[in-house]
């Protein structure tokens, strides 16, 4: 089990040097703090290969631990879960991004995991012949595909739905210009934040122009840019360009780049430590989880009075 919530050791806690006695403890779980990311794994997994980790957990190297028993490793924990998977299974699926492969290879070199280094080098060599665009904008083909993209994304999601053919009436004089401005702003935001946000386009939805914003798999906000107005005794469709509101909601989703509370796997892995904590600390933890959930609902409920079409489904 592993957890990727960034938690810092308690202030004032002084790490101590100790020798790790690994003999006969193959199935024992150890808790690791790798640059603030917390992991649970077995000594057996860490000592299967002849690496620096094997030296640390077979007693050949001294390790740092904090007062709660977490073993401290002064490295970035971003790719440590991938490294653990390689140590367990002897193989992994490498990231698609060249930069992430380079980062993983640097960590593998530090831990002296030569097999993983070779995998990364081979993948980088293969990618020299095929260039991948930096900014990819998927265009969804079905509601099911949209749901899968949003649920599986580790990044916040911004979706622009535009479908001019949905209009039943004539447009107001500025509507075409405003529709184009919405599309242009989407392209600009995609170029600016493509590394931090997943941008997707929807050209088959039921709206004419509508922005949706998602974080951690749930819908946070929606900005509908169309309305029906009456002019010269007939209905017309008006498309607006609420630029400031779109910028505001895009910046809001950046708050959801990393988990705000520990995930279930981490909470389960650290249940022993929590069971020793005071009741007040447990209450604070659950209050935090509940408060975050209510904020999500409250944030989204401000848009409930708008017609959302097939995007209105919201699961708490």
From Swiss-Prot:
Record-linked Pfam families: BTB_2
Protein name as catalogued: BTB/POZ domain-containing adapter for CUL3-mediated RhoA degradation protein 2
Effect the entry attributes to changing residue 278 to A: Slightly impairs phosphorylation level
Annotated GO biological process: apoptotic process; cell migration; immune response; negative regulation of Rho protein signal transduction; positive regulation of DNA replication; proteasome-mediated ubiquitin-dependent protein catabolic process; protein homooligomerization; protein ubiquitination
Modified residue annotations for Phosphoserine: 278, 280
Annotated segments matching region Disordered: 268-287
Entries under PROSITE patterns matching the protein: BTB
Gene: TNFAIP1
UniProt keywords, alphabetically: Cytoplasm, Endosome, Nucleus, Phosphoprotein, Ubl conjugation pathway
Keyword Cytoplasm among record annotations: yes
Natural source organism: Homo sapiens (Human)
Subcellular location: Cytoplasm; Nucleus; Endosome
Pathway it works in: Protein modification; protein ubiquitination
Lineage: Eukaryota, Metazoa, Chordata, Craniata, Vertebrata
Biased composition, class Polar residues, residue ranges: 268-279
Family from the record: Belongs to the BACURD family.
């Amino acid at each position: 089990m592993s957890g990727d919530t960034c938690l810092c050791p308690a202030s004032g806690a002084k790490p101590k040097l100790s020798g790790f006695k690994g003999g006969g403890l193959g199935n024992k779980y150890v808790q690791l703090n790798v640059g603030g990311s917390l992991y649970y794994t077995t000594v057996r997994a860490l000592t299967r290969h002849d690496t620096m980790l094997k030296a640390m957990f077979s007693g050949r190297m001294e390790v740092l631990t904090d007062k709660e028993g977490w073993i401290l490793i002064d490295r970035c924990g971003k790719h440590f879960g991938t490294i653990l998977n390689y140590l367990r299974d002897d193989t992994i699926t490498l990231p698609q991004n060249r930069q992430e492969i380079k980062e993983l290879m640097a960590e593998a070199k530090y831990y002296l995991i030569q097999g993983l280094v070779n995998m990364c080098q081979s993948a980088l060599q293969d990618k020299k012949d095929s260039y991948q665009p930096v900014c990819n904008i998927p265009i969804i083909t079905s509601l099911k595909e949209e749901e899968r993209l949003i649920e599986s994304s580790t990044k916040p999601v911004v979706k622009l739905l535009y479908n001019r053919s949905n209009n039943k009436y004539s447009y107001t004089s500025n509507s075409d210009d405003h529709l184009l401005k919405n599309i242009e702003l989407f392209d600009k935001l995609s170029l600016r934040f493509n590394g931090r946000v997943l941008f997707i386009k929807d050209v088959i939805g039921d709206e004419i122009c509508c922005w949706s914003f998602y974080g951690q798999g749930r819908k946070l906000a929606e900005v509908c840019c169309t309305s029906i107005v009456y002019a010269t005794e007939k209905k017309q469709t008006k498309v607006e360009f609420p630029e400031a509101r779109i910028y505001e909601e895009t910046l809001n989703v950046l708050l959801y780049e990393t988990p705000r509370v520990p995930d279930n796997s981490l909470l389960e892995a650290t249940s022993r430590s929590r069971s020793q904590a005071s009741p007040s600390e447990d209450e604070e933890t659950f209050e935090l989880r509940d408060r975050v959930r209510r904020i999500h609902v409250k944030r989204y409920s401000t848009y409930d009075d708008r017609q959302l079409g097939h995007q209105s489904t919201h699961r708490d």
